[in-house]
């Protein structure tokens, strides 16, 4: 089972014994006349929290101070949960969704429709679509979208395994559910041409503006998008 590759963030060196200067933190951590703003351990914690998506300097500071107030056992449980998830969660060998087993629960479920595959770019999209309770088929996670500017071509995505799955006689339809950004549209059109010789290819109808993200759509919008899918 392939593991999700995540680079471990390296701690930056201490500037001095009195202060830790974190380049990515937007607020000053420099030494003041009567002492430092943060101790080095707290500064390191704030910096690491700020690496998380959508977490800015103030949010990172608030989270760090909140964690310091919690009981040791609670903080240890959080740290252990993070380590366990990092160590155990990888990719499903079939659909490339997140899984702690070689094959994920969705792919193993006996009541899922094996004849329909919904193609998404990211595991978060699987979670969003599952919350609608409308789709009963299987999924395929590409691991991104075609983006030449970022050096991401078809070879960097899980397109070859998708072609292998679609070539099976039992597959009757492939639904392309990729967020409608410029890169998403490029990926959708590319896959449409690639998959049409094998099976019926449809794309979901979006109630989203161009450039919107699938994961942020509400459940009703996603459900209607699935119902209103059209053939490419």
From Swiss-Prot:
Domain Toprim: 115-209
SMART domains named in the record: TOPRIM (SM00493)
Protein family: Belongs to the RecR family.
Swiss-Prot/TrEMBL keywords: DNA damage, DNA recombination, DNA repair, Metal-binding, Zinc, Zinc-finger
Annotated GO biological process: double-strand break repair; recombinational repair
SUPFAM superfamilies: Recombination protein RecR (SSF111304)
Gene source species: Synechocystis sp. (strain ATCC 27184 / PCC 6803 / Kazusa)
Function: May play a role in DNA repair. It seems to be involved in an RecBC-independent recombinational process of DNA repair. It may act with RecF and RecO.
Protein name: Recombination protein RecR
Zinc finger boundaries on the chain: C4-type: 92-107
GO molecular function, one term: zinc ion binding
